[in-house]
Amino acid sequence: MNPIIFTTILLTIMLGTNNVMISSHWLLVWIGFEMNMLAIIPIMMKNHNPRATEASTKYFLTQSTASMLLMMAVIINLMFSGQWTVMKLFNPMASMLMTMALAMKLGMAPFHFWVPEVTQGIPLSSGLILLTWQKLAPMSVLYQIFPSINLNLILTLSILSILIGGWGGLNQTQLRKIMAYSSIAHMGWMTASLHTPYYTLLNLIIYITMTSTMFTMFMANSTTTTLSLSHTWNKTPIMTILILATLLSMGGLPPLSGFMPKWMIIQEMTKNNSIILPTFMAITALLNLYFYMRLTYSTALTMFPSTNNMKMKWQFPLMKKMTFLPTMVVLSTMTLPLTPMLSVLE
């Protein structure tokens, strides 16, 4: 892709997201979502093959449907209130449609079916943008309208997302699909804690950091399957250790960073005398931890059959420069001791 065109597309994606986050008018929010959607499709189709075309088409149809639901909710709200303000939804039907539209854009269950297929069909770099940056705009709108949302509806979507995000990743060998199901589960944790926006923001930051770290290491090793992940010992032994730590952190294993948001969300829910919901969420999170432990096992403790050429890859240095990777790994794995400092947010 032409560098000027690529830069223009990236700037459009950033502008669309920023437009959604800073706008207080529903029409500007809708325009921001459309800019975001139309700009990312050429990036998803960087590799000209049928799989990328199929993934881009699925993404376009899903996001178009979500945008249609969003505009329908805005029009219903306008009929009842006469206002275009983002902060408040005055009609229960408008609130329900808006929640469904944003859940579809975030890839939450039961509107999650597009996420694994689209992520699997696009390059790793496009998957990184899809699973990180593209979550910011819908999450910011969801945060702004949370007082108007039916609490039972959003908690149901959260529980379904955590459950399906864990179940779906159990039988996967494709790393992009595993990251997609992990994204679905993390969206469930974030929306379950929307009543405490600081914890939602903390969860979002840690999720984006961990996901960016994993995709950066996958791209450095050109790794897309469990089999190719097991060969990283031959290519970059040190990076293999970093992959292990980040995988366990994404699974929420203490004492790594990924445990922090889960711990704080469960603690906050129990303070509000909610026992059954956090217990179910904690048990369901074990499904995610299981498939991450399985990835860790196949990477660190097993060696799949490989040719002699594959075994000699350690002789050739990794030529890709990754300036920010050490910082990202530290943030993804070692921030749990900073948890007491977060008490100032309460």
Curated annotation (Swiss-Prot):
GO terms for cellular component: mitochondrial inner membrane. GO terms for biological process: mitochondrial electron transport, NADH to ubiquinone; mitochondrial respiratory chain complex I assembly. Disulfide bonds: none annotated. Keywords: Electron transport, Membrane, Mitochondrion, Mitochondrion inner membrane, NAD, Respiratory chain, Translocase, Transmembrane, Transmembrane helix, Transport, Ubiquinone. It comes from the Eukaryota. Its EC number is 7.1.1.2. InterPro entries: Complex_I_Subunit_2, NADH_DH_su2_C, NADH_UbQ_OxRdtase_chain2, ND/Mrp_TM. Coiled coil: none annotated. Core subunit of the mitochondrial membrane respiratory chain NADH dehydrogenase (Complex I) which catalyzes electron transfer from NADH through the respiratory chain, using ubiquinone as an electron acceptor. Essential for the catalytic activity and assembly of complex I. Core subunit of respiratory chain NADH dehydrogenase (Complex I) which is composed of 45 different subunits. Interacts with TMEM242. PANTHER family: NADH-UBIQUINONE OXIDOREDUCTASE CHAIN 2. This is NADH-ubiquinone oxidoreductase chain 2. It comes from Bos mutus grunniens. The lineage of its organism: Eukaryota, Metazoa, Chordata, Craniata, Vertebrata.
